[in-house]
Structure formats: C-alpha cells, structure tokens
From Swiss-Prot:
Residue numbers binding ATP: 128-183
Gene3D superfamilies to which the protein is assigned, alphabetical: 3.40.50.20, ATP-grasp fold, A domain, ATP-grasp fold, B domain
Nucleotide-binding as UniProt keyword: yes
Binding site for Mg(2+) 2: E267, N269
An individual GO BP term: cell wall organization
Function: Cell wall formation.
Species annotation: Sinorhizobium fredii (strain NBRC 101917 / NGR234)
Name by which UniProt lists this protein: D-alanine--D-alanine ligase
Main location per the UniProt record: cytoplasm
GO molecular function: ATP binding; D-alanine-D-alanine ligase activity; metal ion binding
Domain ATP-grasp intervals: 102-300
Cofactor note: Binds 2 magnesium or manganese ions per subunit.
Amino acid sequence: MSGKHVAVLMGGFSSERPVSLSSGAACADALEAEGYRVSRVDVGRDVAAVLADLRPDIVFNALHGPFGEDGTIQGILEYLEIPYTHSGVLASALAMDKAQAKHVAKAAGIPVADALIMDRREFGNAHPMKPPYVVKPVREGSSFGVVIVKEDQSHPPQVITSSEWRYGDRVMVERYIAGRELTCGVMGDVALGVTEIIPQGHAFYDYDSKYVKGGSAHVIPAQISPNIYQKIQSLAVKAHQAIGCRGVSRSDFRFDDRGEGELIWLEINTQPGMTPTSLVPEMAQHAGLQFGEFLRWMVEDASCLR
C-alpha cells in the first residue's frame, strides 16, 4: 500500500468537461484500488486555494482541453510546488496549439501535411486551398469543431463563419490526407503499440467515434507492415521528445496505403483519455500493464519542473 495522497483533477470548464469527468472517475477508482489516498477535485476557478488546503503529495491531472492541458494548470502546480503527472508548462502549451506543434514537428523532420493558419471570419465564398481539406480549431481537442471540406463542395461550409461557432477564431486549414487512422502512445521515452482506429458509421474519428459506445473499433496491433509500424513508433517518440513531453503522450497519424504509402503526423495529445478502454491504457495493457499498474507508473513518474 502506497499511502500517498493523490488529488485527481477532473471536470473543469472546457468543452471537454464530460470526457474529463469520465477519465478522472476511472483514474480515481483505480488509484484507490492501488492503495493511494485519493481526493477527487472537480476543478473550478478556485483550484489553487482548494489544492493549497488539500496539500496532496501528488496531483494526477485528468483534465482535458483549455486550462487543463494548455500549460495553465501546470503553471499553477509549479507555483504551488506540487508534483504532477503528464507534461509541463511549455510542452503542454505547445501541444495544445496545433499550429505551433506542427512547426516544431516539421523542424524535427517529422512529416506533416501542408496547412495555413487563418481567422475563420476571413472565410468567404472562395476556398483557401484546393479541396479536400480539413478545418481545425487551433486550440481544441476531442475533434470539437473539425470540419472536412470535400472535393465536390463549391464553397466553404457556412458553419465556419457562423455566429454559433464556439471554438475560437483562429483555425488551421490542412490538406486532407486519405487513408487509415493510426495512433501511437509514448510512455516515458518508449513507444507503446500502434493502434488503428476504425470509425463505425462516421467519416472520421470525431467526438462520437471517440466517446459513444460502439463509435469506433480499435485494432491493436495495427495490421500494417512491420516497417511502417516501427516508423510510426519512432516518429511518436520523436514528436514526444521534440515538443518536450513528459509522462505519457499520444501521436495521431494518417497512412495512405492505397497510393505511394504517404505517412503523415497529425498532432500530439499530452492529456490522452484515461478510462480503461481509452487508447493509451489499451496500448499499455497490450504491453502487459494493467490499468492500475499503468496509473501507478504515472503517479510515481510525477514531478515539478517538467
């Protein structure tokens, strides 16, 4: 029995609050089963005062989205000098900003798709690049706000300039990469297995594919050639290190095996989902680590100055 006091941060106030509550509850239950003393913290604006009162030995960060994975909560934890899981201030901020993460990845020699950054309000009737392309909010996760513009669309979808848009004005317009959706977790500086994600009844791995039961199938190990499998693992570690990640991360890729075999890195996630059936815990289990053991590793890896 560990006896350490772990505060599990969950919820928060981003659009990914429901996802975070699910991750946090699963982690808290598993950590209690591992012998830790756990405090469940539904994060509000007073989180610094709450943590100062709780005085935990370690914070397990199960937050998703802005505030929880953009360097903000990490900065608060550094100020409070409480060791925490996952990446630190700089890596979290870089990874949350898809445009900046892409610049860093490209500079490290990681293959990325052509893209441009623009204000979504500048979209008119003309396409900013030749379709097909993908429009992504620069600072959102869980595929919130992602729009695929197909070849047969004569002008950009109106939803992008709509007053109902809730995902920020800065967007990335990225060349659409056909092919298979592949992802690889990294634990420390070691690649886990490669998983293929097959959305069920969805055009891509959107919110419902990720979080609705039966929304997607996960195939691990991915049924791809050994050299592509190993290349994905190598690129995932390279991205993890280039961006400065700590603990665990997950890199997403597209692989077009129908043509020239183009393999493209899409993005890195410093706060991947943490339920037992989430992608990275599945990868850890494939490597021989049960969910509780995996979380124990993350807690023991926690530190400040990450």
